[in-house]
Amino acid sequence: MDRLAELGRPLRVGGENPPSRSELERDIAGACAAVVTITERIDADVLAAAGDGLQVIANVAVGFDNIDVAAAATMGVTVTNTPGVLDNATADHTFALILAASRRLVEGDRFLRSGQAWVWGPRMMLGLDVSAGATLGILGYGRIARAVARRARAFDMRVLATSRSRTSGDEDGVRFVDADTLLAASDVVCVLTPLTPETRHLIDAAALARMKPTAYLVNTARGGVVDESALVDALTAGRISGAALDVFDNEPHVDPALLAAPNLVLTPHIASAGAATRDAMGVLAVDNVAAVLTGRPALNPVR
């Protein structure tokens, strides 16, 4: 807040809870800049409510599917995001989910808390040995994916990836393949692609059917990339071994079918929730606002 105050503009500060649509339109009216998070849906109507003085919308996130970027561009409003500063925190959480799902950590915790009598056995809650030659497949190969790949290589995993810019070859121990090959060959499939019209429900029933029955799915990208109904069906039928989700198609609502699904680890969109990381995201968002309001190019413009 101090950094924003230094700009010499009046501030309107929201509360901890996401604003309603009417509150958002009220608060953004007459603003020259808006710092928002993924809970705020900035569409053409909200932009119109802001008025002609709005110059920049700084999204405190890498993904920006909550903002109508085309409508903003039409109105001459710069949209920015916060890439880079959250790569390691998100990669850490992604790998934590890989281990939690594949080694059945949450299942074990729930089992003990249930109070059931138990006796240790050599085949109790067997999971995937990720460091015994398991293959990690990464859908989408941006900065966060590269950070996940580095962690996977430290666990001696074989890493496959898909990329819009290349479909074959190797780079830093990562082999690039097409999506079908990746799905069929991977022991863990990690979704790290942005949500676009082309990637919505990229992981559908057909994609899940291509995966090994022993494989796990992890999504820390955007909820809409995975068809949640198809995932529930696959888990319930045992067509894949398990999954872990940090993001959901209709946040903050989580489909009750997901809550009831077996072998599924869920976290509430907290992959970047390291204290230092969140501070850095906020600072970068404010730096983008400061740049635009002082006539300089935005540091992280979204196009």
For the regions a protein language model found, what residue spans apply to each?
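N-terminal Rossmann-fold NAD(P) dinucleotide-binding loop
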Residues: A145-R146
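An N-terminal-biased, well-structured beta-alpha scaffold segment characteristic
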Residues: M1-T80, A184, D204
